[in-house]
């Protein structure tokens, strides 16, 4: 494992998803899933999210579209919050989901719009 890249990834992960969310995920690490968490931090968040060629806002926008298409509701919730943290507006999220509708199908968009509204409501309630 590249410890420097792992640490960089962990820092980015906390900045995007929130320190509380990441710390909660890490407190559930055991010998079975530790290698996966290391991979997640080093490769996903360090090696890819840590690249300079795309800003975090753009990466978040891409993630919303891809995760919507893959029908991963838990991850969509997490990344919608991260996208807002990275400066993606609610209007931009709506437009991403409109694009999902025409290229990936209405069922994917219906679920994603519902999840986005739930996330917005949760945030608005504090």
Where are these regions (language model features)?
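Residues forming well-ordered secondary-structure scaffolds
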Residues: 91-95, 108-111
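Short amphipathic alpha-helical segments at helix boundaries and their inter-helical linkers
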Residues: 36-38, 72-79, 100-115
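Short alpha-helical scaffolding segments that buttress acidic/His motifs in well-ordered protein cores
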Residues: 40-44, 61-68, 96-101, 112
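A general alpha-helix detector
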Residues: 8, 12, 44, 61, ...
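Mid-chain, well-packed structural core segment of small domains
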Residues: 61-94
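A short structural micro-motif
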Residues: 31-32, 68-69, 86, 99-106
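Acidic, glycine/proline-rich low-complexity segments that act as flexible tails and inter-domain linkers
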Residues: 1-57, 85, 110-126
């Amino acid at each position: 494992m590249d410890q420097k890249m792992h640490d960089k990834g962990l820092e980015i992960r906390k900045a995007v998803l929130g320190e509380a969310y990441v710390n909660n995920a890490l407190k559930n690490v055991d010998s079975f899933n530790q290698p996966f968490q290391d991979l997640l931090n080093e490769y996903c968040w360090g090696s890819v999210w840590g690249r300079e060629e795309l800003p975090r806002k753009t990466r978040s926008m891409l993630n919303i579209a891809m995760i919507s298409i893959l029908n991963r509701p838990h991850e969509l919730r997490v990344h919608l919050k991260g996208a807002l943290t990275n400066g993606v507006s609610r209007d931009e999220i709506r437009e991403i989901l409109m694009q999902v509708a025409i290229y990936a199908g209405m069922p994917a968009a219906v679920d994603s719009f519902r999840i986005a509204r739930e996330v917005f409501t949760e945030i608005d309630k504090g």
